[in-house]
UniProtKB/Swiss-Prot annotation:
It comes from Streptococcus pyogenes serotype M12 (strain MGAS2096). InterPro entries: FAD/NAD-bd_sf, MnmG-rel, MnmG-rel_CS, MnmG_N, TrmFO. The keyword Metal-binding does not apply. GO terms for molecular function: flavin adenine dinucleotide binding; tRNA (uracil(54)-C5)-methyltransferase activity, 5,10-methylenetetrahydrofolate-dependent. It is found in: Cytoplasm. Its cofactor is FAD. Keywords: Cytoplasm, FAD, Flavoprotein, Methyltransferase, NAD, NADP, Transferase, tRNA processing. Catalyzes the folate-dependent formation of 5-methyl-uridine at position 54 (M-5-U54) in all tRNAs. FAD binds at G13, A14, G15, L16, A17, G18. This is Methylenetetrahydrofolate--tRNA-(uracil-5-)-methyltransferase TrmFO. One of its GO terms (biological process) is tRNA wobble uridine modification. NCBIfam families: gid_trmFO, PRK05335.1. It catalyses: uridine(54) in tRNA + (6R)-5,10-methylene-5,6,7,8-tetrahydrofolate + NADH + H(+) = 5-methyluridine(54) in tRNA + (6S)-5,6,7,8-tetrahydrofolate + NAD(+); uridine(54) in tRNA + (6R)-5,10-methylene-5,6,7,8-tetrahydrofolate + NADPH + H(+) = 5-methyluridine(54) in tRNA + (6S)-5,6,7,8-tetrahydrofolate + NADP(+). One of its GO terms (cellular component) is cytosol.
Length: 448
């Protein structure tokens, strides 16, 4: 297939990946037609028509360079990521993590793209894969049925899927502050989480209620298949009595404050279990229940989650929901630039490629956008070094074992190992990997 001679590039979908791709293309002087169906047709999970809307958590996760996603964010900042820049401008307190005011952040991304002179925003549903120009498809895990059928045809079948869930959000003014305390785990960064401590007796009663609560019916006949990073809390609870104690209800590093007077197990300094609440908006009026993605019926959510100390009278401004997320057989279908092996004028980006997480989705859009622009200009494809986070992630999703392919968060395990003797101290090893990654990225960019 010959390269398109169109004078613009299509980007379909204005989520995190599509927004990033559109910006990266436009900043390279190429006109963009950015299609977004929200405003014409709603999705089950989106609440607004803003671009790059966050439908699950409001956290971009760890911000330290000793954390792989922290490294990825720093690499993206050096590549002038619109998602990172607007995220920074709308940060809310989150200890050692990066969390954002979800509405302010999405509104600022939307305004920047809508006001860009080279970006033509078209509010319309696309049901066919365009063949008039180079195209980036970033319609996400909530792709409309009509377009999904065409993408599945490109895939040669129905592809894969998993179920994703979002956590409830509560009104802070309805929390009983006498039963909770402000603290970040291990006192890392500023104290940014409200902690709801549980005694063993409270936890056991909560676990029983959670595992016997009624779930909402699925809209699909297909077998449930969850991504481990966004598993419903009730599914986690059913895996074992202590599973949650090693996950979102882990108490380590969250000792009682000296002035705590609530119930506790004997003289223990640490609760048996802790439920954490994280600020969800800049005003600090909304908090989400960390790690409590759920698919329980709404009435059951209210009944069970009001068993959490401090939330007995909590008002839920949004209940948790679950939805199907689709992703492609990327190892067989895509190159490391997220370009289709079957159609070189076609790129894919976002969670549909098998990257998992807000930051990872935006990163895939950044890579796809840069390379769509380079293809337009008839320049050589840009493959980032495997020593970097932004290079290792696309390499992983396009080289994994197709038979066992699952969505992947960025992590140090997929980044090329350091040369020389192994550094035994994990923190020092991660610091060395990050230092090498940023140096290699700078070298890569300087050579362009």
């Amino acid at each position: 297939m010959s390269q398109s001679t169109a004078t613009y590039i299509n980007v379909i979908g204005a989520g995190l990946a599509g927004s990033e791709a559109a910006y990266q293309i436009a900043k390279r002087g190429i006109p963009v037609k950015l299609y977004e169906m929200r405003g014409v047709k709603a999705t089950p999970q989106h609440k607004t028509t803003n671009f790059a809307e966050l439908v699950c958590s409001n956290s971009f996760r760890g911000d330290s360079l000793t954390n792989a996603v922290g490294l990825l964010k720093e690499e993206m900042r050096r590549l002038d990521s619109i998602i990172m820049r607007n995220g920074e401008a709308n940060r809310v307190p989150a200890g050692g993590a990066m969390a954002v005011d979800r509405e302010g952040y999405a509104e600022s991304v939307t305004a920047e793209l809508e006001n860009h002179p080279l970006i033509d925003v078209i509010r319309d549903e696309i049901t066919e894969i365009p063949d008039d120009a180079i195209t980036v498809i970033a319609t996400g895990p909530l792709t409309s049925d009509a377009l999904a059928e065409k993408i599945h045809a490109v895939n040669g079948g129905d592809g894969f899927y998993f179920y994703d869930a979002a956590a409830p959000i509560i009104d802070k003014s309805t929390i009983d502050m006498s039963k909770v305390y402000l603290k970040s785990r291990y006192d890392k960064g500023e104290a940014a989480y409200l902690n709801c401590p549980m005694t063993k007796e409270e936890f056991m009663a909560f676990h029983e209620a959670l595992t016997t609560a009624e779930e909402a019916p699925l809209n699909s006949f297909e077998k449930e298949k969850y991504f481990e990073g966004c598993m419903p809390i009730e599914v986690m609870a059913k895996r074992g009595i202590k599973t949650m104690l090693y996950g979102p209800m882990k108490p380590v590093g969250l000792e009682y404050p000296d002035d705590y007077t609530g119930p506790r197990d004997g003289e223990f300094k640490t609760p048996y279990a802790v439920v954490q609440l994280r600020q969800d908006n800049a005003a600090g009026s909304l908090y989400n229940i960390v790690g409590f993605q759920t698919h329980l019926k709404w009435g059951e959510q209210k009944r069970v989650f009001q068993m959490i100390p401090g939330l007995e009278n909590a008002e839920f401004v949004r209940y948790g929901v679950m939805h199907r997320n689709s992703y492609m057989d990327s190892p067989n279908l895509l190159t490391e630039t997220f370009q289709s092996r079957n159609n070189p004028n076609l790129f894919f980006a976002g969670q549909m490629t098998g990257v998992e997480g807000y930051v990872e989705s935006a990163a895939s859009g950044l890579v796809a956008g840069i390379n769509a622009a380079r293809l337009f200009k008839r320049e050589e494809a840009l493959v980032f070094p495997q020593t970097t986070a932004i290079g290792s992630l696309p390499h992983y999703v396009t080289h994994a074992d197709s038979k066992h392919f699952q969505p992947m968060n960025v992590n140090f395990g997929i980044i090329k190992e350091l040369e020389g003797p192994r550094i035994r101290d994990k923190k020092e090893r991660y610091e060395a990997i990050a230092s090498r990654a940023l140096a290699d990225l700078d070298t890569c960019l300087a050579s362009l």
